[in-house]
Curated annotation (Swiss-Prot):
Annotated InterPro entries: ATP-dep_DNA_ligase, DNA_ligae_ATP-dep_bac/arc, DNA_ligase_ATP-dep, DNA_ligase_ATP-dep_C, DNA_ligase_ATP-dep_cent, DNA_ligase_ATP-dep_CS, DNA_ligase_ATP-dep_N, DNA_ligase_N_sf
Organism: Methanosarcina barkeri (strain Fusaro / DSM 804)
Pfam families membership: DNA_ligase_A_C (PF04679), DNA_ligase_A_M (PF01068), DNA_ligase_A_N (PF04675)
Residues at the catalytic site: 214 (n6-amp-lysine intermediate)
Taxonomic placement: Archaea, Methanobacteriati, Methanobacteriota, Stenosarchaea group, Methanomicrobia
PANTHER family for this protein: DNA LIGASE 1, DNA LIGASE 1/3 FAMILY MEMBER
Broad class of enzyme this protein falls into: ligase
CDD domains (UniProt xref): Adenylation_DNA_ligase_Arch_LigB
Protein name, entry field: DNA ligase 1
One GO term (biological process): DNA repair
Assigned protein family: Belongs to the ATP-dependent DNA ligase family.
Sites where the protein binds ATP: 212, 219, 234, 264, 310, 387, 393
Alphabetically ordered keywords of this record: ATP-binding, Cell cycle, Cell division, DNA damage, DNA recombination, DNA repair, DNA replication, Ligase, Magnesium, Metal-binding, Nucleotide-binding
Cofactor dependence: Mg(2+)
Amino acid sequence: MERKEIKDSAYLFLGSIGPAFENITLGIGDKLALKAIAGAYRVSEEEVKKRYSRTGDLGDVAFELNQGEEKSLAIDEVFGSLKEIKEASGKGSQEEKTGLLSSILQRASPKEGKYIVRIVLGKLRLGFGDQFLLEAFSIAFTGDKKYVVKIKESYSVCTDIGELAESLAEQGPKALGHFSIKLGRPVRSMLAQRVKTFEELEERIPGKKAAEEKYDGERVQIHKNGEEIKAFSRRLEDITAQYPDVIEAVRKGILAKKIVLDGEIIAYVEGGKANDSTGEFYSFQRLMKRRRKYEVQKYTEICPVAVFFFDILYLEGNSLLKKPYPERRAILEEHVKESEILHLARRIVTDNLEEIEDFFNEALEKRLEGIIIKSMGRNSAYEAGKRSWFWLKWKEEYASGMRETFDLAIIGKYYGRGKRKGSFGALLCAILNGEEQRFETFTKVGTGFTEADAKEIDSLLSEHIISEVPKNVLIKSRMLPDIFVEPSLVIEVLGSEITESPSHTAGQGEGDTGLALRFPRFLRIRHDKGPYDITTLTEVRNLKEGKSI
C-alpha cells in the first residue's frame, strides 16, 4: 500500500475523508442516497424504500441490490469520488452528488457499495473508534503492541489520524515523540481526575496548590495564527462560526501573533458582569443555543458569553506543553488582556484546605460546578489527552456523600406509558469497556427528564435507531430494549451506589454477574462528548472498590 493510500485508509476507517477537526460533511442525506442507489442498480425508488423500511440501513440495501460480479475499487478511486461529492456545490449540486454516488456504486462490489453508502451517510458502524485504530497502527507499523501508549500520546498532539498513520508507516517507532503543536490542528484536552474525599485533595497534591473555578460551559481551544483565528471544542470540532463575538474579542484582546489558549466558554446572566466575583452564570444547556448553523447573530445577542482562559499551550512558535503549570499560568496572564468577553479563570494559590473549602462554596453560590485543584510542582506539565493527577476536580455532587456522576452512552429505549406515551419511558445506558472496545449495559434511566429533555433526546436519537443489537454492544436478553440505538448520544447521570447485578453486563465475570448503577437520575445531555469519551469499566471498578477514578 502506498503512503497516500495509508493516509486515506485511516480516514475511511473512521468514516470520513479527513481529520475530525475539519468538520467534513458530504452533503448527502437518506433521500439523495436512496435516489443514487435506485439509479445505480436500476430499480425503482419505491423498491429501495421498501427494503430500507425492512433493514433500516441503506448500506444493507445497496449490498442486497448489487448482483454484479465481484469487483475491487482502488482506495484512491473511492477517496477521489467522495471528495468530488463533498466539493459539489451551487445550483444543480444535489443532482451532481447523486450522479457521482450512483457512478461509484456501479463500479463497486456488493460489500464495497455497502460501506461507501454508510460512509456517505456518516453511519459507518464498524464497531470501533480511533483508539482501536491506534492499537492496530502499533502492530502494523512497529510490529509490537508495546508502542500503543506512545502512539496514543502522539495522537493527543497530532490529532490528524491520517498524518499520524502516514508518519508511522514511513518511520516506524522513530516517528513517535516528534509531533508538536501545529496551529489550526487542535490538541486533545488535558482532563482532571476525580477524588473521593475533600481530604484526598491534600493527599494527592500536598502543600501549595492552585484552586480554580470550574465552569459549566463548553471547553474551547483557541488558535490564533496572525489574522486567522479558530475555535475548537473538546471533541476537536471546529466551532469558530458559532462564536463570532469570541473570535472578534480574541482579535482585539490577544496581541500575540501565534498562540494557543485553553479555556471554557460560558453563558452569563444578562445585565450582569461575567468577571464579577459575585456574578451568576447559566448552565451548559443554555449555552447550547449557540451551537447552531443559522441565526448565529440573533443568538449571539440572546445568549451572551464569556471565555475564561486557564492555560496556554503554544506561543510564537514554541510549544509550552512541557513547562510546569506555574510558568504557563504566568505566561497566560501576560498575554490575555481581559475585557467584557475575555477573562482569566479566577483562582487562589494556598496550602490551606479551609481556604480552598471557602473558595469552593463561593463557586457554588455563583452556580458554578465546583473547583479544579492544580499542582504547582516542577513536573506539572500539560498532559494532552490524559486524565491527569496534576489536576483534581471537586464538584457539588462529590461533597454531598455517596452521589456520583457518570457519562453514559444510550444504547436502547423502552416505550413510555401515561404522560410519556409517544416517547420513551426509560433509556438503557452503557459504560465503555476500553480493553474490549465494547459498550456494556450499566443502568436503566427513567427519572430526571423534563418534557423538553425527552423531546430533544428523541430527536437526537431518531437518526441512530437500528434494527438489532450493535456488534460492539453487550446486552443480556432480560434487558433487551424495545428500540435499539447505536452508541452516539451521551448523557450525564447521577447515581447513588454501584452494585452487582445479574441483569447488566458491565464488567461481567465468569459468574454471569455484572455491575449496575442504583437510583440513576438524568442530569443533562453531554453534547461535548462522544461515545468513546464516556465513563469506563476501569473507572466504575475503582469507584466500586472505594478508589478514585
